[in-house]
Curated annotation (Swiss-Prot):
Belongs to the universal ribosomal protein uS3 family. This is Small ribosomal subunit protein uS3. GO terms for cellular component: cytosolic small ribosomal subunit. One of its GO terms (molecular function) is mRNA binding. GO terms for biological process: translation. Binds the lower part of the 30S subunit head. Binds mRNA in the 70S ribosome, positioning it for translation. Residues 38-106 form the KH type-2 domain. InterPro entries: KH_dom, KH_dom-like_a/b, KH_dom_type_2, KH_sf_prok-type, Ribosomal_S3_C_sf, Ribosomal_uS3_bac-typ, Ribosomal_uS3_C, Ribosomal_uS3_CS.
Length: 210
């Protein structure tokens, strides 16, 4: 079970929490679609800003969006000019007042989503997949990860037949619910087709009572 299911969804309500924090009754479907629209828009718009996670909170017809990023300077811009433009674009998209909160990810090497996106970027630049995987594993362990597993699937190295290769170092206990496991997925669009990159990063165990 732990091998197949999304590690974050599996731990929701145990040690992980939801990325959308709001409650609705009759407008639930509409707001859910709005969340999806906001997330895909922000991911495309801030593609080069290293966005790790987008949290959405709603209350009284207003939306607060927390953006976790490795490069906050790119999103904020000179004297906050970029943020103001982004706010206007989001308000137009949702017809609501939008508040933005930009939070810096201090150690991108310990964020599974950012690690996956970094590997995907290297694959698009024609770096050998094994080298990209090993480099990311080494740097994550150096920054304090207890274990990491990276999987690449697709036409690796331009091979005729697609295959899956993975590389792991340290412990990655997928069945242990108290294990703090971060999960990230990214796609590399290469000339041979799409290569999927999955990253499972074990940060340690969350002890009960915390």
């Amino acid at each position: 079970m732990g091998q197949k299911v999304n590690p974050i969804g599996f731990r929701l309500g145990v040690i992980k929490t939801w990325d959308s924090k709001w409650y609705a009754e009759k407008d639930y479907a509409k707001l859910l679609h709005e969340d999806l629209k906001l997330r895909s828009f922000l991911k495309k718009r801030l593609y080069h800003s290293g966005v790790s996670k987008i949290e959405i909170e709603r209350a009284a017809g207003k939306a607060k969006i927390n953006i976790f990023t490795a490069r906050p300077g790119l999103i904020i811009g000179k004297k906050g000019s970029e943020v103001e433009t982004l706010k206007k674009e989001l308000a137009k998209l949702t017809d609501k007042e939008v508040y933005l909160n930009i939070q810096e990810v201090r150690k991108p090497e310990l964020d599974a989503q950012l690690v996956a996106e970094n590997i995907a970027l290297q694959l698009e630049r024609r770096v050998a997949f094994r080298r990209a995987m090993k480099k990311s594993v080494t740097s994550s362990l150096k920054f304090g990860a207890k274990g990491i597993r990276i999987t690449c699937s697709g036409r690796l190295g331009g091979a005729e037949m697609s295959r899956t290769e993975w590389y792991r170092e340290g412990r990655v206990p997928l069945h242990t619910l108290r294990a703090d496991i971060d999960y990230g997925f990214a796609e590399a669009k290469t000339t041979y087709g799409i290569i999927g990159v999955k990253v499972l990063l074990f940060k340690g165990e969350v002890l009960s009572g915390k």
